[in-house]
């Protein structure tokens, strides 16, 4: 049986900065959520192929061409332990065609605890002309013995050229839903769901049919 996931995402735009926030309930312990996030951080720093295979399921090219107006293809990742940052390399696709190749992004991860809540902040320090400023925080919070919440707050300000191209509408159609789906992937993995591209194809079809 297919259950369509219905979510509510809040996105604002102020002075060129997009801010997306989202929270979802997770039917498992905070220990399981933390293990999933630990695995995600490890893959982010050391294994981009596994990161894509496990956590980016359903985030790539879509049948709905509007969702392909702008998206990124992750190519490689290197972690520099002495500097405590990751160096990522990706391609930018516009309307499903290569637009920028081998864009270098340097980012760092800061993992802290605030009481029982875990906050994982990712800061982008360098992204060439693609991004002027970007940072985001994932929050993992226990709400019961086998109940948790996963939340995100993401801020993105693109470089001047992309600010012309990426309107609020384009951002909504190409980026918003991918951020939400990434959090949903973290949730489903924590709950023990075996994620596949077919899983999200069925979910998308169910939402369209509603």
Regions found by a protein language model. Give the residues of each.
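Terminal "cap-and-tail" regions of soluble proteins that handle hydrophobic small molecules
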Residues: 2, 10-33, 39, 137-210
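Hydrophobic ligand-binding cavity/cleft-lining segments
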Residues: 2-87
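Generic structural signal for short, flexible, solvent-exposed coil/loop and linker residues
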Residues: 15-20, 40, 59, 77-79, ...
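Glycine-rich portal/gate segments that line the openings of hydrophobic small-molecule binding cavities
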Residues: 32, 62-129, 184-210
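Glycine-rich loops and low-complexity Gly/Arg-rich segments
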Residues: 53-56, 113-117, 148, 174-180
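Mobile, glycine-rich extracellular loop/lid and propeptide segments
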Residues: 134
